[in-house]
From Swiss-Prot:
It comes from Enterococcus hirae (strain ATCC 9790 / DSM 20160 / JCM 8729 / LMG 6399 / NBRC 3181 / NCIMB 6459 / NCDO 1258 / NCTC 12367 / WDCM 00089 / R). GO terms for molecular function: ATPase binding; proton-transporting ATPase activity, rotational mechanism. InterPro entries: V-ATPase_116kDa_su (IPR002490). Involved in ATP-driven sodium extrusion. GO terms for cellular component: plasma membrane; proton-transporting V-type ATPase, V0 domain; vacuolar proton-transporting V-type ATPase complex. The keyword Zinc-finger does not apply. It is found in: Cell membrane. The gene is ntpI. The chain crosses the membrane at residues 373-393, 460-480, 496-516, 522-542, 574-594, 601-621. Belongs to the V-ATPase 116 kDa subunit family. This is V-type sodium ATPase subunit I.
Amino acid sequence: MAVTKMEKVTLISDKKNREILLQAVQGLHAVEIRDLFQESENNQWVETFFPEPEMIDKDKELAKLSYKLTDIRTAIQFIEHHGEKSQKKQHLKRRELSLDTLEKNYSEEAFSKKLEEVLLLKEQWEQLVDERQQLEDQENWLLNWQNLDLAPKAFDSQMTKLVIGTVNAKNAESFKAEVAEINEAYLEEINSSPTTTYFAYIVLRADESRMEEIASRYGFVKEDYLYEGTPQQQLVAAKQSLQEIKDQQKKLSSAIGACSGYIKDFEWTEEIFLARSEREAIKDRIIHTPYLILIQGWVDHEEKQELIHMLQNILASEEVYLTFDEPTDNEIAEEVPTKLKNHPIVAPFEMLTEMYSLPKYEEVDPTPWMMPFYLVFFGMMVADIGYGLLMFLGAFLLQKLVVLPRGMQRFAKFFEILAIPSIIWGFIYSSFFGAALPKEIFGIHLPFPILSTTDDVNTILILSVIFGLIQILVGLFIAAKEHIKRKAYVDAVNDGFAWQGILLGIILILLGTMILKNNAFVYLGGALAVLSAVCILIIPVFQSSSKAKGIAKGAYNLYGLTGYIGDLVSYTRLMALGISGGSIAAAFNMLVAFMPPAARFSVGILLIIVLQALNMFLTLLSAYVHGARLQYVEFFGKFYTGGGRSFKPLKTVEKYVNINHKKK
C-alpha cells in the first residue's frame, strides 16, 4: 500500500441537521473538516457565493463545556483522594463502542444529580478541613501558653493590666532584668524555646507607658488572648473540638467512598463532553446561513462508501446534498493531508515514519520498504530467544486481556512482530538469556549456533555490511522509481541507477579478485563502475547552463561516494550491538554461577532476574533507537523527503473508551 488517495467531500443540509451530521461524521473518524474561511486560493469561491455567512461564537459553548469538564475531573479526583480506602474505586473499563451508543446511554438529569451530590460533599469536606486547620493552629498556639494559670481578660481592671507576648530568646535575660527595676510590675516566664521566650506581665496603669517603652526596645511582640477561660481550659476544649472534627471527617469519608460507583459514570460523561468539545471546536470552519450549513472536508476514498451509508442511515436522501471531488493540483501542493494505509503487519511500523516525517501526498510511503529491513536489523541486535519470547508473550497477552488505547495497541503489535526476528536470530546465535543452546537433545544433533558470536565475528561483520549494502541499493532503486514516475528519466539515472552501478561494479571487482579469482568479473565490474561514474559527471553538464558549473557539480556529486563508505560503516553496529547484548547476558549468568549454592538459589535468583531485566531493557532500547537511526539516515536519505501534513479527522478523544463507528 501507499499514501491513501483522498477525495474532497462537500455536504449541504438544513441547519437543523447540523448536530446530527457532525456527531455522525465524528463517530466515523474518517473526515477531516476543512476550514472554509482560511485565506487560500482553494477557498476563493466562499466569498463569491457566501459574502455574508453567519459567524459562530464557539468560545462561549467551549467555555461551558470546559467548566463542566473541570467539575467532572474535580469530582473524580475528590472521590479518589478522600473516599474511604476500603471502598474500591470503580473506574470505567476501556471497551469499544459507537459514539451513538455513548451518547444514548447518557442522562443529563442523572449526571447532574450525582455531580451535585459529590460537589456538596466536597464543600462539606473543605469546610471541615478549614475548621480543623483553625483548631490545630489554635491548639499549637495554646500549647505555648498552657502554663499561664489565669485568664488575661478576667484579670484586667482600672488599676492593672495583664499583657502576654514573646521576646527573642537572646534578649530574655536582659528584658527580665530591666523590668525588675519597675517595683510595681510583675513579669513571669511562661514558656521558652531555643529561639523564643514567652512572657506575661502585670503592670499598674500608671506605669504602662514605661513598660511599653522597655518592651519595645527588646522587641517584645504582644499577643492577643481572645478566649474567656485559661489557656489550659481552652486547650482541653480545642482538643475535644478537634476530635469531633476528625470523627465527622471519618463519617464524611465513608459517604464519599459510597460515591465510588459514580466515577465510571463521570468518566463516561467526560468522554461525551470531550467529544462535544471537539465538535464545537470545528463549527467555525463550516459555513452557516439562516437555513443551510455547508461542510467540506477530506475523506479516504476507501471510506467514501462508509460515509455515504452512514448518511443514508441518519437522513433521507433529499435532506442532504453530497458530492465527492478529486483534489486539484493546487490543493495537492498546499492542503491535502497524508494518511498512511498498509497491511496490518506493516501498519505498526508507520509510527517510525511518523516520527521522522510523513510523506507528502504524492510521495512514496517508505514504510513497506523499510519494514523488512527494520525487522532484520532489530532481530540481529536483540538476538536472544528468551528476550524474544518475553516480548511476544507480553505484547500478545496485553492485547488479548486488555482493551488498550489505540496508540498502545499499535505499540504492542509493533513489539509482538519484532519478537519473531529476535527469536530467529537468537537461534542463529544460539542464545537463550545469554546461555548457549545444547548441542543435542535426545541424541538429536542441533545445528546451533549457525553463527558464533565468538568465532564468527568477521562473518557477522561482513553480513552486517551486506545487509546495509542491500538496503542502500533498494533506497537508490526507490529514488530512481520515483523520478521515473514523475517522468524525470535523467534524474532517475543520476540519483539512482548510476550510483547502483558504481556500488554493483565495486562488488563485482571484489568478488572477482578476492573470492572467485575471475578477471571477467573484475573487468565487468570496472566497466560498470566507470560508466556509472561518467554518467554522474556528465549529466549535470547537460542540465546546467554553464558547462564549467556542470562539471564542478558532477565532480562534487561523485565525491559523494565517500559518504556511502560512511553509510556502510554505520551498519557494523548490527554486529556490535548483537554481540554486546549477548555477552553482557552471559556475563551476568556467569556472575551468579560463581556464587555459593545457598546464595545462588536465594539471592542469586532475584539478582539474575534484575540483571537480565536491565539488560533486556537496554538491549531493546538500543535496537529500537539504532534501528530507527539506520532507516532515517542511511535509508531515507537516499530517496525520501517527507514534510507531509498529518490527516486529522474529526474524531473523539478516546480518553476512556475506543470509539468504533460500527455499532456494538
